[in-house]
Amino acid sequence: MDKKYDFSLSYEALTRVCENAICEHIRRAGSLEGLGFALEYTKAYAILEVWSLLAAAGDTFPALIEKDRIYLLQLISGKNNIEPH
């Protein structure tokens, strides 16, 4: 990583990409047992962690980040009764 590259990604695009990736890992976990099941959920939580770090690094309102964090967490836990922003 000798060269520095800048790129732009909207908060909405970041959230959408992470939401889709989380949903894919949860979908895969549904057909697995044991270690495979646990690994897919671990990947989903890792995506949530990276999303949280990137969202906080941007200039987004903390209340919006918290609402979306809860939404993504509920996707992982299966309690998705909150709509995304």
What is the predicted role of each segment?
Residues 2-38:
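N-terminal acidic leader/helix
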Residues 35-78:
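Short, charge-rich amphipathic interface segments used for partner binding and complex assembly
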Residues 1-4, 81-85:
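Short intrinsically disordered terminal tails
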Residues 10, 21, 71-77, 81:
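Long, C-terminal folded domains that constitute the functional core of proteins
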